[in-house]
């Protein structure tokens, strides 16, 4: 049975950190809903290779509508974490112990949600100190799975491992 996966995304996301996991999730039979501030608008990746149409506004969704959350990296998470609606949406997944998949700069939303304390995680080099300051035990590995809930990776190079572990967690 396919799972419903929320994807929080805005302008200048890292293209492959959305497109490759999205493809893997869809091929495995899961349904993705791209969430941003405004339904129907198109957001572009920072590399210029991906354009995504927003399926739903953050104002029209609830974490209870979904089984898991994907947070692609790039500049998108830094913009979204300035909006408390996205922070609270992210926090709800962690509080409810639903799977959360965050790659590269994706953990920035988890930092603002105060959801990393006591957890093993990884992320892009430039945010690792921020993650540590948020209480995370930061590990420099291609993928880190914590408590059968949180999957994190560092960069686009880690996408195959990120996808593998994310899909495995969805099967549990």
UniProtKB/Swiss-Prot annotation:
Pfam families linked to this entry: DJ-1_PfpI (PF01965)
Start and end residues of each PfpI endopeptidase domain: 3-171
Enzyme Commission no: 3.2.-.-
Active site: 104-105
Factors inducing expression: By heat shock, salt stress, oxidative stress, glucose limitation and oxygen limitation.
Keywords: Hydrolase, Protease, Stress response
Keyword Protease assigned: yes
GO terms for biological process, alphabetical: proteolysis
Matches recorded under InterPro entries: C56_PfpI-like (IPR006286), Class_I_gatase-like (IPR029062), DJ-1/PfpI (IPR002818)
Keyword Hydrolase appears in the UniProt entry: yes
Gene ablation phenotype (knockout): When combined with a yraA disruption shows significantly reduced growth in the presence of formaldehye and methylglyoxal.
Origin superkingdom: Bacteria
Coiled coil: none
Enzyme category, top tier: hydrolase
Molecular function per GO: peptidase activity
PANTHER family xref list: DJ-1 PROTEIN (PTHR42733), DJ-1_THIJ_PFPI FAMILY PROTEIN (PTHR42733:SF2)
Function of the protein: Functions in the protection against aldehyde-stress, possibly by degrading damaged proteins.
Assigned protein family: Belongs to the peptidase C56 family.
Name under which the protein is recorded: General stress protein 18
């Amino acid at each position: 049975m396919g799972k419903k996966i929320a994807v929080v995304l805005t302008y200048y996301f890292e293209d492959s950190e959305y497109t490759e996991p999205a493809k893997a999730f869809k091929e495995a039979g899961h349904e993705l809903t791209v969430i941003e501030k405004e339904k129907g608008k198109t957001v572009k990746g920072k590399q210029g290779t991906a354009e995504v149409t927003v399926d739903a506004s953050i104002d029209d969704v609830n974490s209870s509508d979904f089984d898991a959350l994907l947070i692609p990296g790039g500049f998108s998470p830094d913009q979204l974490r300035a909006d408390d609606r996205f922070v609270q949406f992210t926090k709800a997944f962690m509080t409810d112990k639903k799977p959360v998949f965050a790659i590269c700069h994706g953990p920035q939303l988890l930092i603002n949600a105060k959801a990393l304390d006591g957890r093993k995680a990884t992320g892009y080099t430039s945010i690792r100190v921020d993650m540590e300051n948020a209480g995370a035990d930061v590990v420099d590995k291609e993928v880190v799975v914590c408590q059968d809930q949180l999957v994190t990776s560092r960069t686009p190079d880690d996408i195959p491992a990120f996808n593998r572990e994310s899909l495995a967690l969805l099967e549990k």
